[in-house]
Design a protein with these regions (language model features):
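Small/polar glycine-rich anion-binding or flexible loop at a beta-alpha turn
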Residues: 183-189
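Conserved beta-strand/loop scaffold segments within soluble protein domains that form the structured core
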Residues: 1-167, 171-172, 190, 196-218
């Protein structure tokens, strides 16, 4: 399932979802009503977005992957709240920020576990990929844990594209821009892992993403 700038409440029960956010400012609410593991992924472009995820029953499992390209003239803001209100739930969130130019990036995420819940777990991983000489990065992870017998963890990575991989690809005949594009294309491809989507539509989104990257890398 795919939607664009859909601010209405999303109820996840039996279908994984990809959403495209572009030139949007507002809030998205997601309610977990699933018993089988699901995935929510989103490409977040030029957007000031707040996402609230709430469990609606015990036993819900969700994998979230958010890809956020950031450019100089459009500072990005992303604020995610993971509210685990029931026992035996699991939410794993990964935020990848691709900083394409001398840009400002602000991403914050909160894991909140209510009193009394048991055997729930949540992890937050924030990755910042620096594709420019100077960047302004502000990540604000918050763990609000009010219960025992649960698991919560946070991790962060800041890195540049792998120079050894770039050199290897160039040794195989690619020029520097082609090698860079090949490495970067792996990030939007991860959006569609576990998502039912037509190959043509997936390739179009990846192509548009790479065009966006080229325009802001020039």
């Amino acid at each position: 399932m795919i939607s664009k700038n859909n601010k209405s409440e999303l109820i996840l029960s039996n279908t994984s979802v990809f959403e495209l956010w572009n030139w949007f400012s507002g809030k998205k609410e997601i309610s977990l009503q699933n018993t089988q593991p699901l995935k929510y992924s989103a490409l977040v472009l030029d957007t000031d977005l707040e996402i609230d995820v709430n469990t609606a029953q015990s036993g819900s499992t969700l994998e979230m992957f958010l890809l956020c390209p950031v450019r100089e003239d459009q500072p990005a803001k992303l604020n995610v709240h993971l509210n685990l209100l029931h026992s035996q739930c699991k939410i794993d969130l990964q935020i990848v920020s691709l900083v394409l130019s001398n840009a400002k990036n602000q991403a914050s995420a909160t894991i909140c576990m209510q009193p009394g819940i048991q055997e729930s777990a949540s992890t937050l991983l924030e990755e910042t990929v620096i594709l420019w000489n100077q960047v302004n990065v502000r990540n604000l992870p918050i763990l609000d844990i009010q219960s025992n017998n649960i698991q919560a963890a946070h991790g962060a990575k800041i890195y540049r594209l792998d120079t050894e991989k770039l050199f290897y690809l160039q040794s195989k005949g690619l020029d520097s821009d082609q090698a860079r594009q090949l490495l970067i294309s792996a990030y939007p491809a991860r959006l569609f892992e576990g998502i039912e989507i037509e190959e043509k539509e997936k390739n179009q989104i990846i192509s548009e993403f790479l065009t966006f990257d080229q325009l802001n890398h020039a």
